């Protein structure tokens, strides 16, 4: 039924846009004509997909590389096979092969613009066939259509635990903020996986309208493994909010989150906290005092500066300068000072420190970090000659430069310069197989 309605819609649209050939056809006749055309096309669809059924009945995880090729081949048959693939989402037999076939047909459909058959997916998702419902929920996450969000939201209240996780994942893929008020109550469930998915969705959708509920959920969250997800949400969605800041500050005690998450929290507070929020500034000053010249101290000083207190940066830089006067070959100290200088926009001095790190580096990982920092610093200074010089010296591959460009806008701009492109062409030729 769903498959045929999809074909019917496509046929009606084609007929409606045709000119001379169909000028004499009555609108009343269009559904019947569409049904007739669908019946005539069905044998061709069956024949086109027949070579694929056995392969698509294999377990995906055990045959991933092979099935990815076959799924790609099947998708290249185009929209004409959509009706047959939709039928396979609703197996008539409860067998492993039938379930595998449904899942792999869904993977083919993912590549065929699910938004063009969202009506059929909505019907399957609202139906009572468990396999079809599951596969349709997953496909709706790839259907860029307002109806997808409406259908997924409507299912939350009655869905089982597994389906709820998939519904929230699909909403996250769609970045559909308007579903947030339906989703956020799920933070009150005892399902940790579901709560984790809810937080990931809210951050991806930048759903700031539900921040008060998330603040309340954080105050009662008993699973420390989820705390980084709360930090991610507030970092992505909340700005200059005292209530959110008050909920986050206790995490700086570091008895519930690790060093890396503490670093992320310090960075997030530079935007989440209101400016000159005294409890935040007091906590950050304490971190500078207790962590000497570590990365935590650097991030705390930079966040303090963003909140209106420049003294933290001044004090920390003075401490680093004093230590480097006594320990002039200590690469780790240069690295912390370079990070501080880069963060406050002093790119020339940061570049000097990154070069010192390269001279005194204590390992390949530190050297690589220094080259990345140096390239980003020179790109911000628009020193193209220096950018090319350091690209040559770094020994990095074209692919590594492309990854850096994808992450860093100023370096991406520098990559477009003629001199940089000329160097990259030479580098690719030198690394090409002989």
Q: Model-flagged regions — what are they?
A:
Residues 308, 314-320, 424-434:
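Pro/Ala/Gly-rich low-complexity, hydrophilic intrinsically disordered segments
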Residues 1-9:
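Bacterial N-terminal signal peptides that target proteins for export
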Residues 27, 42-55, 77-92, 114-126, ...:
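Amphipathic alpha-helical scaffolding segments comprising HEAT/armadillo-like alpha-solenoid repeats
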Residues 92, 128, 159, 190, ...:
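Alpha-helical junction/boundary sensor with strong preference for TPR arrays
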């Amino acid at each position: 039924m769903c498959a045929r309605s999809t074909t019917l819609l496509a046929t009606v649209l084609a007929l409606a846009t045709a000119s001379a050939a169909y000028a004499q056809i009555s609108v009343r006749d269009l559904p019947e004509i569409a049904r007739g055309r669908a019946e005539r096309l069905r044998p061709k669809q069956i024949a086109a997909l027949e070579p694929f059924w056995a392969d698509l009945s294999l377990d995906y995880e055990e045959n991933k590389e092979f099935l990815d090729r076959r799924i790609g081949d099947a998708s290249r048959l185009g929209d004409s096979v959509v009706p047959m693939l939709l039928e396979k989402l609703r197996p008539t037999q409860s067998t492993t092969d039938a379930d595998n076939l449904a899942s792999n047909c869904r993977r083919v459909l993912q590549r065929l613009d699910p938004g063009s058959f969202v009506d059929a997916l909505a019907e399957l998702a609202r139906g009572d066939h468990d396999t079809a419902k599951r596969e349709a929920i997953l496909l709706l996450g790839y259907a860029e259509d307002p109806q997808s969000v409406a259908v997924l939201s409507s299912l939350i209240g009655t869905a089982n635990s597994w389906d709820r996780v998939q519904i929230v994942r699909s909403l996250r893929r769609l970045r559909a903020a308007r579903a947030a008020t339906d989703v956020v109550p799920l933070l009150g469930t005892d399902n940790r996986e579901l709560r984790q998915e809810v937080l990931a969705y809210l951050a991806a959708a930048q759903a700031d309208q539900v921040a008060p509920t998330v603040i309340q959920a954080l105050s009662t969250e008993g699973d420390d493994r989820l705390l980084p997800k709360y930090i991610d949400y507030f970092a992505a969605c909340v700005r200059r909010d005292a209530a959110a800041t008050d909920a986050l500050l206790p995490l700086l005690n570091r008895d519930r989150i690790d060093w890396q998450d503490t670093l992320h929290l310090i960075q997030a507070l530079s935007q989440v906290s209101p400016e000159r929020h005294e409890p935040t500034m007091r906590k950050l000053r304490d971190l500078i005092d207790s962590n000497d010249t570590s990365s935590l101290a650097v991030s705390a000083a930079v966040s303090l500066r963003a909140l209106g207190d420049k003294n933290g940066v001044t004090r920390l830089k003075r401490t680093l300068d004093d230590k480097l006067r006594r320990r002039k070959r200590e690469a780790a100290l240069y690295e912390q000072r370079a990070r501080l200088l880069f963060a406050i926009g002093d790119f020339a001095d940061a570049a000097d420190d990154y070069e010192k790190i390269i001279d005194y580096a204590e390992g390949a990982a530190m050297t690589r970090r220094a080259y990345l920092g140096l390239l980003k610093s020179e790109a911000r200074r628009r020193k193209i000659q220096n950018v090319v010089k350091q690209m040559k010296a770094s020994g990095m591959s074209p692919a590594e430069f492309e990854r850096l460009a994808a992450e860093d806008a100023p370096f991406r701009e520098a990559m477009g310069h003629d001199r940089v492109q000329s160097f990259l062409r030479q580098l690719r030729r030198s690394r090409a197989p002989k």
